[in-house]
Amino acid sequence: MKVTRKRAQRERRHRRVRRKIFGTPERPRLSVYRSNVHTYAQLIDDIAGHTLAAADSREVGEAESRVEAARKVGELIASRAREAGIERAVFDRGGYKYHGRVAALAEGARAGGLKF
C-alpha cells in the first residue's frame, strides 16, 4: 500500500509540474524517468507529440554508481541534442526531487552543452 501511495504522490507532483512546462521544437522538454536500476531521458516536442532524442543508462556501459550513470546519460542526451540541432531545453524532473540521479543527469546535460 505504501509503494502505491508513494507512486501516486510522484505522479501528482509530475502533473502539477507539467501544467507549467511545455516543450516546443525549438526548446523541447527534457523529461527524466527513474527506475530502481536505470535512468532514462527524452527530449520531447509536446506540440507534435514526438520524441526528438532519447538516452538511458543501459547505453552508457559500466558506471561506478547509478548517480554516475545518470551523469553519463545527461552527457549522452546533450550530444544527441546537438546532433539534432537543439541547444536549449526545458527541464522536466518528472515529479522527482532535484537530487541524486536527477540532479546528476541535469549537470551532465549542462556539461554536454545543453542549456536550461
Curated annotation (Swiss-Prot):
Stored InterPro entries: Ribosomal_uL18_bac-type, Ribosomal_uL18_bac/euk
Highest taxon in the source lineage: Bacteria
Cellular component aspect of the GO annotation: cytosolic large ribosomal subunit
UniProtKB keywords: Ribonucleoprotein, Ribosomal protein, RNA-binding, rRNA-binding
A Pfam cross-reference name: Ribosomal_L18p
GO biological process per UniProt: translation
Entry's family note: Belongs to the universal ribosomal protein uL18 family.
Subunit structure: Part of the 50S ribosomal subunit; part of the 5S rRNA/L5/L18/L25 subcomplex. Contacts the 5S and 23S rRNAs.
Function: This is one of the proteins that bind and probably mediate the attachment of the 5S RNA into the large ribosomal subunit, where it forms part of the central protuberance.
Annotated protein name in UniProt: Large ribosomal subunit protein uL18
Organism: Rubrobacter xylanophilus (strain DSM 9941 / JCM 11954 / NBRC 16129 / PRD-1)
This protein's encoding gene: rplR
